[in-house]
Amino acid sequence: PSCIAYNNNQVYVGQGAKMLKSKLQPDQNIWFSFKMNLGKDNGPEFTRTELKEGNPLGKIENTLDATKLFFKKLKTEIDNYIQEQNLPRQLFYSVSIPASFEANQRADLKKALEFANIPINETLFIDEPNAAFLSYLVQANNNGFNNYNIPVDSPLHILVFDFGAGTCDISIIEIGKKAGKLYSKNIAISQFEQLGGDDIDRAIVKEILLPQLAKQNNISVEEIRENNYKKILLPKLQAVAEQLKIKVCKAVASNKVGQELPNLINSTERINFLQTIDFILPKQVMKFENPSISPKEFTDIMKKFTSETLAFNFQDDVESLKSIFTVINSALLKANIEKGDIDLVLLIGGSSYNPYIQTALYRHFDNSDIEIPQDLQSHVSNGTAINSFMANGLGVDIIKPIVSEPVFIILQNEVRKTVVYEGTEIPCKEILIEDLRPQRNDQKEIEIPICVSTKDKILTILKLKSEKGFSTTDKITLKCNISHDKLITFRAFIQNLEISTEPLNPFAN
């Protein structure tokens, strides 16, 4: 898991850090689901951090810091293992990331990897759903995928549903035959949305646990200050909500009949978290004894996350609430196919253990095969290792990656000019944007916003410079290259002479 902790003057990452979740304070000495905030330039985010500038172990003052330290610690552990096991020292890396990660997020991730001295190559990144599918392919003899026939004129469409703690990622993969050869490629990736199991936990806190806490302390919810809720109550209550969610899901799953949810989902019997929690607020101390939830209350919350008709799109810095079908529909729309065209739905990610999610997908994709592996959380890591072997060892790219969102420049009068269309296979040929002209004579700098998806998401601002000044007769050509890892570079020319370009810091998302 994307988790890093600081405890007893030691830094922990992954599962070791996650095990400390209930003992530590979020954004103070434990950080999780932080990768979703990469690509933002918010300055110092974690004002209460215990890892400040000057700490010999490193600093965590924002998301990029957390990511840098995460990979640095991971790299150290890998190097130690290689040395202990006396393995070859020449290493090649493959890193799995959310498929819907945009270029600015990938650029930040690359910075973190460079900080950790992890070597960068063209095939470093693989989208998590694609990695999961690679693992699934390798295990085809055990999971029945080898029973599929692939007609020449009718390729298979596989929808990989990757639902984790902080992400809901959809990748639609096409497998077909062309010129007697088998091919596989991405045809769509869902739009980036901040949706995951953590959002279910936050909904439990706000709708169930917060009213209980207020009642036990003889106050109203309205009397709880927003700042105290965000910084003190929510972090602790979210961990409790996660445990209650797991308890309800296990009870419901064990009583399922086929793929239908049991009558237990309407039960009002309380499921308890047997513990007393103290909250020290600036002006009072609050106690919370045995937080609880009923299956019916949890069912009401899950209806919102699995609604096919309601478009939940409420979002602020505390919570984001969307249905999983918001994400699914965005991928189907991009692929220009109907749900009935999907042959197989493959579930991946820890939050896919949720029986409400599974049942919702069975009902929605009623003409598709649904595959739920026993281990939902290992396929991504296994597939990433397979990708590293295939790409670094054999030079083979099994699934052709695509651009998930259009990239465009903004010209005079807010005119948009598309540079890269969504769905473009990458790496692609160099893209030329020709016949751009300065707006006035003697202009020494020209700024061109480069956007992804919408004009509100600025990837970077390209600054063109000329010491003698531009002329309105100058014909400017931009040359764009996009790598296998979806990282974009621009160069500018006037009459075949390259001119100085300088990217400004983006403020995306």
Annotate the PLM regions:
Residues 1-116, 200-258:
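Phosphate-binding loop and its immediate beta->loop->alpha context
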Residues 1-5, 178-206, 498-509:
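Short glycine-rich, Thr/Ser-proximal phosphate-binding strand/loop in the N-terminal lobe
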Residues 35-41, 55-62, 196-359:
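Gly/charged contiguous loops adjacent to phosphate- or pyrophosphate-bearing nucleotide/cofactor binding elements
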Residues 43, 140-185, 347, 476-493:
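Gly/Thr-rich phosphate-binding beta-strand-loop-beta motif of the actin/hexokinase/Hsp70
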Residues 117-131, 358-385:
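Conserved phosphate-binding/catalytic loops in two-lobed NTP-binding clefts
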Residues 123-161, 379-396:
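Conserved phosphate-binding catalytic cores of ATP/NTP-utilizing and phosphoryl-transfer enzymes
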Residues 150-152, 214-239, 244, 251-253, ...:
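Acidic, glycine/GT-rich loop-and beta-edge segments that sit at the periphery of enzyme/chaperone cores
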Residues 184-194, 222-226, 367-372:
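Short beta-alpha connecting loops at secondary-structure transitions
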